[in-house]
């Protein structure tokens, strides 16, 4: 990340995103921490703005808010939705300005809209073969997001593209040219059930059930 020839490390933790610099002798030291990003479930690094250093997209699954917008303390800081949820944690694009100095460029790059969808994973790849890295985000509880890199440090939302807005419960992503036509194809793994009856964790969804039922099923 600091372009000094060795591999650095970036981790998602409950204390935020933490970047460790490699001193070149096998020792890593904490360089910078982002405490406002405590719910990262996935990350992807690439030089999206082609300035010579790696930038990072962070998928934040949880939000600090519940449905009423209040701050919660303890585990499970938000309810578990069923479908098409938009109250997850906001995803963040961290632009590397050199020397391990990262700046939140989400708004500037056009990635700040419709980006709170309980995102599990992201993938950078040049899907349109124009020489820059595009971005796809796998979202739990709803449609995925796809952004085309405009080559000028910004992105255009193409989430309505066929096969992207599939409404599944996105868990993972991988790309390869499986049909050898020179274009990257995409596989999105999902955890999905079409069952009409579901067991939900929210206590208000099963308030009318007796104690034995709650202990057995929940």
Give the predicted meaning of each segment.
Residues 1-218:
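Acidic, glycine/proline-rich Ca2+-coordinating loop motifs
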């Amino acid at each position: 990340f600091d372009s000094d020839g060795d591999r650095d490390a970036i981790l998602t933790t409950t204390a935020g995103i933490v970047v460790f610099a490699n001193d070149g002798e096998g020792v890593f030291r904490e360089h910078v921490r982002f405490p406002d990003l405590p719910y990262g479930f996935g990350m992807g690094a690439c030089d999206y703005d082609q300035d010579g250093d790696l930038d990072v997209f962070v998928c934040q699954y949880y939000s600090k808010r519940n449905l009423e917008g209040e701050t919660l303390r303890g585990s499970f800081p938000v309810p578990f939705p069923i479908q098409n949820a938009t109250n997850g944690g906001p995803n963040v694009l961290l632009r590397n300005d050199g020397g391990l100095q990262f700046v939140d460029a989400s708004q500037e790059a056009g990635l700040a809209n419709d980006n709170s969808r309980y995102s599990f994973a992201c993938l950078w790849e040049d899907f349109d073969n124009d020489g820059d890295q595009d971005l796809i985000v796998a979202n739990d509880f709803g449609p995925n997001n796809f952004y085309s890199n405009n080559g000028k440090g910004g992105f255009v939302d193409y989430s309505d593209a066929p096969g992207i807005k599939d409404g599944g419960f996105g868990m993972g992503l991988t790309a390869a040219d499986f049909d050898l036509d020179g274009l990257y194809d995409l596989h999105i793994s999902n955890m999905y059930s079409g069952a009409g009856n579901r067991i939900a964790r929210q206590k208000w969804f099963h308030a009318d059930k007796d104690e034995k039922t709650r202990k057995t099923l929940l």
